[in-house]
Amino acid sequence: MGGLTEISFASQYGRALIEGAEGLRKQELKLFGTYTLDGNTVRLFDAERLYYNTSAEKPCWDYDNTQYWISKASYNFCAICPYDAPCTFSDAEGRVILGNYEATTGCPDLLYASAQRDLAENEDFSTVYLNFRHACAAVQFNLVNASNATLIDVRNIRLFGMHNVGTFSFGADGSAGWVFIGSVLNDYSQAYGGACTLPNGGLPVNLNVRHSLYDGGAILVLPQTIYKTGVTLHLEYKKQGDAEYAIRNIELGWLGGSTPTEWKSGEKYEYNLTITDNTITTEVKVVDWVDHYVEL
């Protein structure tokens, strides 16, 4: 092709809530890209679908609208996962904008990436690394039975008191942020309702066994301050021999000690809920949740 170098794709796996490289490949990616030459900016990739081509001689990331590097141009790349995320690219701001994103139980992971390349001073046609980061935070609630009886049922699970709808935007320079839409979830919202399926026969008394409160595991939440707010986890449970369900409202912003004061983008928080005979205690820790890498 007259010495032109194609912009191609490859993948390298890192860990994420999307569990494994296959998760990223199944979701596919949406790419926006521009180049600027002699003061003129041109849209190079406009919501281009990146897919993992397993039929290629060597399986790789691929796309249909082949593009080539242009000497002396400067490039901006922005990408988002999943592909069907309803986002647009603002030429005026040079940012990808995802409006009215609603975080709920079971919503898909949301990842974003950006990169820049300036060929004006250096004719570098090598791989551009896109580091996909998590736009949301993740929380995992686990049950531990330290009581004197088997836990036989958990019901009416819900998380409320925080924002769950917002607009997310990010640019090729790596800047990113959220703007909340509307008020916080109230007690009656089912956005973060959930179910807890216990093992056959119930959850036994065992300090070494942690059972996920939500059947789906970790849930996504918008990054926000929780310290001294009304963010609350509600659940009701019954142990073997109990006449009634125990009703618990755990105020996550008032746990004290060294517990996190905010949920940060790209961080995952594990809340271990230990059920004793008459109460429930909570321990919180930040656990590993790192990112996916895609080579451009």
What are these regions (language model features)?
Residues M1-L296:
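Sec-type signal peptide cleavage vicinity
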